[in-house]
Every structure is written in structure tokens, then in C-alpha cells.
Amino acid sequence: TTPVIQFNSVRKIVKTSSDGLGGKIKIDSVIMSVDFQDGDGDLGLTVAQIKANPKYKDFSNFIVDVLIQKNGKFVPVTFSPRLGGLVNFPFLPNQKPGPIEGTIDYSTPFVYAFYKGYSPLFTEKNDTLKFQIKIVDNAFNVSNTVETAPIIIFQD
């Protein structure tokens, strides 16, 4: 069956890390949480499943599109590679197929030193972003798309 998701929350963790050259760099990590349901529980793959089946070679089951506010409107930002990827959904305890539901978190870091290089749409500070999220089950059924609340990164 096709998975269904709902927006749960979006939050930011601000931290400073070493740049490896004796300096410090600022990192804003954005954590997006979505609630999910899937009637047959075929979300998430084991390493063995990925290795055994070539159709999962470049499989992404958590897809994130980024929007930035410009002149009062949100416009898409192209990331290469795209945000998201292969997320480990919690497996059913008995490994038998069946309905599954829960909450999954996805975190992506924005490193201040490289931030403007991600996209020409980005500015130095105080960009307002939103994220559109969808998930894909192991049969390649694509969920509905949810949108996060806006969040400001590299805020003064």
C-alpha cells in the first residue's frame, strides 16, 4: 500500500565545530520529523536486501525538496546531490509483514562556510527555508508530500 505521512515538527540545532585549521565554523542542523503509516510495513531495507536486489542500488526512501523565501514567496532551491536518501525506518519486531507506523527524524547540516555555495539564492544570514518531504516504500509507492513550517537559518 502507499505510505501516508504527516508533518510533525522542524527544529534547528546550532553548533560550532573546528574547521581543522585552528578556526571555528558555524553549523545549523535542521531536523525534520514526520509521522508515517504504511499498511504493509514495507518501509526500510536491510543491508542484505540492498545487496541482493539491484533495483535498490540508488534507492532513496526519504526525499526532501528545499524552498527559500524570496520577495515574500517560497521558491525551490536545487541541491546536488538532492537532500534525503536512504533512511532506516524502524522494522517490525517480528520481521513479518504488516501495518507499521511511527515517527522518523531526518537531519541535514548547513555549514556556514559553504552555505552560499549551496545555491546562488542563499544569502549570508537569516534565510527562511521550508522543506517538502515524501517517503517511498520498498515497492516504490510514493507517499503524499508534506511541507514543514518555515525555519530561519544562520539567524543573527
Predicted regions, residues:
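Non-catalytic macromolecular-recognition regions in eukaryotic signaling proteins
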Residues: 1-18, 23-156
